[in-house]
């Protein structure tokens, strides 16, 4: 049973990496299409910065040698995902173009899924022994 449980979490971790890379690409592409008017520059910069920080903290978690560092970086990745969601929602309010709002809405939905997955992953890592030894696989390069 433990092997299948571990396998499920390895699959979820791989899913998380795939989703993070895709949504970061979507955020960067979207940011390039936003206007640089009142406050727009700051919103774009912060949106991209926090989106990329999610991946950065996941990489740091995977490189952690101590369970405390692993947990801290996973938690920080989740907080950065929540912060990115804030910037995306702010951009949605500031943007008047329907097509941009549609794209933002899609990305916001993706971030809700990522925040949920990170929350489940954090809960999993806090309840299982030796989790750091099994979940330091990093992103898959294809």
Locate predicted features.
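Short, C-terminally biased terminal segments at protein or domain edges
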Residues: 1-56, 64-142
């Amino acid at each position: 049973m433990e092997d299948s449980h571990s396998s499920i979490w390895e699959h979820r971790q791989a899913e998380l990496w795939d989703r993070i890379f895709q949504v970061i690409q979507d955020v960067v592409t979207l940011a390039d299409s936003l206007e640089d008017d009142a406050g727009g520059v700051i919103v774009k910069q912060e949106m991209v910065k926090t989106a990329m920080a999610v991946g950065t903290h996941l990489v740091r978690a995977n490189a952690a040698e101590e369970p405390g560092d692993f947990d801290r970086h996973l938690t920080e990745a989740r907080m950065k995902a929540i912060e990115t969601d804030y910037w995306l929602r702010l951009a949605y309010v500031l943007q008047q173009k329907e097509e941009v709002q549609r794209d933002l809405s899609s990305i916001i939905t993706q971030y809700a899924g990522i925040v949920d997955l990170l929350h489940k992953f954090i809960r999993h890592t806090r309840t299982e022994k030796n989790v750091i030894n099994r979940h330091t696989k990093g992103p898959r390069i294809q």
